[in-house]
Amino acid sequence: MERAEFHLSFVGDSVIGERANCEAGAMIANYRNEREDKRIRIRIGDVVVDTGVEKFGALVGDDARIGANAAIAPGAVIHARTIVPRLSLVDQGA
């Protein structure tokens, strides 16, 4: 993750692209305590991929920007050059 910048945030067990930026207070959660089945799944288009693990954050693409106090759910995919507005929730619900 060359030159990625993350300011006072929680980033749990995630894959972060180059030059990604995360403003203060943003959270990338890595555990789904609200579900019976804790395994993390990732939705890519119409395909759901089971990671086989209970702790996995998000896939954050190159040059993505995550605004202050945004909440990113486990298994979320933030594509390259995506801008997540401040106070947003990103949850693909896979």
Residue map of PLM features:
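Glycine-rich hexapeptide-repeat left-handed beta-helix
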Residues: 1-94
